[in-house]
């Protein structure tokens, strides 16, 4: 019997990247999946890719906005209703973008900060009450929550706020047997980094700050999410750890690397 057999995992923003890779690993260990995303086409592609690797996996799809309160509430309940339980919630929704803080207007700054909080808060708010037998909530933070990087002020502010939300939630929900943790990816090829990750000047300078000498990919991050979701991390809560090739050891590149 697989270690997650019988468990239900609700994954928000599940149509690509880190979420898709994490869903695949959860399914491989026996979890049934309930995937929420904005695009039916991309959700279908995610399902097909998972089934290529895990034939027979139980996968339920729900098209909707993972930043919309009614949608997340409805989806969390639907995930629970599949088998009368909700064991794992994975929140991956984020908003990228770059630019100096003094060039941001209030609306843009607010959108970027809340784009890294809104869906994750909703996942917590409506997922946790359905975890009646305890469970694990895992979020995707960022090394930007710990390392000041010029040009990522709005993004960093949102991720830093997420880190404190995780700590408070872990304290509040621990007595109910619900753990809340996060991974902090370094610079990773993902939807939120497509605007700049292939710029040679930026990546070459950034890689000087990465001891392992390469950018991340989704398959680097997913095993950490799988670990935090499963029983192997049963005595961990309120934590966040870096999967970053060692970037946090050396810190940010000098100068305005993310002002493109």
Which sequence ranges carry the predicted segments?
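Short C-terminal tail/terminal secondary-structure segment
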Residues: 226, 237-260
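Conserved glycine-rich cofactor-binding loop
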Residues: 8, 15-16
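Residue(s) in the substrate-gating loop at a strand-loop-helix junction
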Residues: 142
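Short, small/polar-rich loop/turn modules that mediate ligand/substrate recognition or access, typified
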Residues: 174, 179, 236-238
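Substrate-binding pocket helix/loop in short-chain dehydrogenase/reductase
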Residues: 100-101, 105-113, 206
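Alpha-helical segment proximal to the catalytic Tyr-Lys
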Residues: 129-130, 171-172, 234
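Active-site helix of classical SDR
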Residues: 124, 158, 166
């Amino acid at each position: 019997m697989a270690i997650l057999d019988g468990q239900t995992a609700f994954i928000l923003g599940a149509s690509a990247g880190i979420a898709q890779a994490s869903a695949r690993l959860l399914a491989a260990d026996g979890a049934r999946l309930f995937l929420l995303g904005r695009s039916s086409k991309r959700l279908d592609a995610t399902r097909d890719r998972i089934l290529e690797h895990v034939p027979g996996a139980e996968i339920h799809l729900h098209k909707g906005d993972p930043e919309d309160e009614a949608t997340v509430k409805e989806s969390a309940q639907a995930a629970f209703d599949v088998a009368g339980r909700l064991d794992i919630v994975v929140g991956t929704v984020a908003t990228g973008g770059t630019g100096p803080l003094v060039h941001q207007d209030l609306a843009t700054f607010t959108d970027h900060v809340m784009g890294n909080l809104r869906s994750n808060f909703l996942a917590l708010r409506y997922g946790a009450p359905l975890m009646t037998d305890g469970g694990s909530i895992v979020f995707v933070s960022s090394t930007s929550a710990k390392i000041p990087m010029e040009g990522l002020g709005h993004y960093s502010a949102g991720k830093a706020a997420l880190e404190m939300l995780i700590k408070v939630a872990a304290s509040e929900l621990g007595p109910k047997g619900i753990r809340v943790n996060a991974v902090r990816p370094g610079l990773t090829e993902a939807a939120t980094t497509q605007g700049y990750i292939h710029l040679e000047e930026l990546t070459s300078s950034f890689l000087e700050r990465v001891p392992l000498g390469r950018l991340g990919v989704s398959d680097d991050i997913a095993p950490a999410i799988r670990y935090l979701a499963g029983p192997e991390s049963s005595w961990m809560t309120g934590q966040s750890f870096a999967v970053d090739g060692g970037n946090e050891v050396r810190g940010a590149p000098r100068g305005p690397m993310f002002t493109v």
